[in-house]
Amino acid sequence: MDRNTELRRLAQALHKPAESLNYLDKLDAVALQKLRTQFQNSLLNKFGPVFEKIASTGKLAPDSISATLCTKVFGPAITANMSYFTPMNKAVSLCKLFDADFMAEVAREQIPERTATMLAELPVDQLKKVTAKLVEHGDYHVLGGFTDYIPEKKAFEIMEVIKDPAANLHISFYAQRKDRIAKLANMQSDEKLIELIAAAFSDEQLMVEVGLITCEMDAKAQERMAKLTDKVNKEYRSQARSKAEEMGYADRLKAYFSA
């Protein structure tokens, strides 16, 4: 688990810059994750029975009426909390009646750890529309949280609709499962990876991110990344080595640097 990723996710949940949380320096990634989930679950823990009752009441109502209540009366925050108690077939039907803007607002309020089943059941076309809307507004932290739980096949299809390579890296910036990101990256074409590499080396934070992703790849995949990096710029691997040594992950990139 990457500590910096978890710190960024906690900062987003608290609506504070990560730099302001230096009083948490003694906490490791697991402790930061626990703190974040406790904070995100606090409202649900307090009002869970209320949200469950509202969701239960809506089970018998026609989907069109339930959808109107969600968008016109409850709003995105209550709808997000109700979603954890709504039968999955009902939730999927309602989502088909929501526009992408409202779905994106609901996504911003949801707790990623509680959405795995919903992400597995929602049609990928709906997820693509929500993703496009969140990318449009720069909500990379929201997408990063969901990336840890969305089925890999769907995640790969969604990556295809994100045209800006830097956006994919910004999303990864907030994803804890770098191993899953590495697997998805390895499924991309050489052309796509070259675009990602070029975007990464234009921003120091993204260069670190692509380094952490490459750390999770096997030797063969690292060698492929090395060759593609050289195609972009033969000086880039030297820059990557300096940053990796500074950040302490150079020993995990032996195949990348020796290729």
Whereabouts are the PLM-identified features?
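Hydrophobic packing positions in regular secondary-structure scaffolds
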Residues: 1-259
